Amino acid sequence: MFIDSVKITLASGDGGKGAVSFRREKHVPLGGPDGGDGGNGGDIIFICDNNTHTLVNFKGKRELRAQNGAGGMGRNKNGKKGENLELVVPEGTQVIDAQTNEILLDLTKEGQRELFLKGGKGGLGNTHFKHATNQRPDYAQPGIKGESRLVRLELKLIADVGLVGFPNVGKSTLISVVSNAKPEIANYEFTTLTPKLGLVDVDEYNSFVMTDIPGIIQGASGGKGLGLAFLKHIERTSFLLFVLDPMREMLLKEQFIVLRKELEKFSDELFGRKFGIMISKSDSVNLGEEFAEQIALNINELENYLKEINNPQSFLIKVSSLEKTGLKELKFMLLEEIKALRNNK
């Protein structure tokens, strides 16, 4: 199950209370204080692990608490520190204050370890309060309460290339043939119901990560279809690949215009991201001469429109995932763009 957003209360452990205790030995009837300190409460720690892919482990949990520190004991024995609660999350997880929407943590690197809530300090035992005028103090400190915070965990997948397109245009087929991802593929819309990540090996030394999200429909930025819930997953991609389908009723030019508008409505930053254009199902020209002519006109209209707006795309390529034509060229084009973006960081 793909879970990418949860609301939960997190609390660090309370400090243990200090002990009130006095030495009790056979020949020492009025022994001095020997109360130990309380242990510190456990901390809440986030750990970023790329073997974890969703927030499903947090599903249905309203609160998670670290262990309280143990109380102090006699004979100056300090209480044990409460166990830390280590929360393992996928790369791309943000910890957000549920009330203010402030981003408190941004976990983006494998192995990243962040202290989120510090456990409460243990109270001092009565040993600490002995002085000249009070040789037998009968009080100790209570432990300090741990911290508590209502947060929202949001997962934004991190990938180099994000696929953008309408439902059933060939995005899932593409990612299945160029990467190790195995999405469900069928001839109906919204086959992809959750984001998919795939590692694309270009050659022996170079690879990049591609993500496929559920198809965007007109109005996705306003909440229609599945697009809005998952558009955030391409916010962290370095490069966008628009996948346009010449078999759709909507012309290629119109597909491109609508998709760009939806991105612009969702995020100015996403709209300004570098992108390429892939025309999928290029094998469809084999369906007959008349059909091939229609597709050629369709592509020509798109190319003319792109010229009018000064060719904002990095490249335009025709690909057939079925016949595996254009795939090698596409992978090298994407790698070139990603390398350039990495070098400019």
Swiss-Prot record:
Q: Where is the OBG-type G domain?
A: 159-339
Q: Which cofactor does it need?
A: Mg(2+)
Boundaries of every Obg domain copy:
1-158
Q: Record's Gene3D superfamilies?
A: GTP1/OBG domain, P-loop containing nucleotide triphosphate hydrolases
Q: Which residues bind Mg(2+)?
A: 172, 192
What the entry lists under PROSITE patterns is as follows:
G_OBG, GTP1_OBG, OBG
The record's SUPFAM superfamilies line, in alphabetical order, gives: Obg GTP-binding protein N-terminal domain, P-loop containing nucleoside triphosphate hydrolases
Q: Name one GO molecular function term.
A: GTP binding
For this protein, the record's HAMAP family field holds: GTPase_Obg
Q: Could you tell me what this protein is called?
A: GTPase Obg
Q: What is the lineage of its organism?
A: Bacteria, Pseudomonadati, Campylobacterota, Epsilonproteobacteria, Campylobacterales
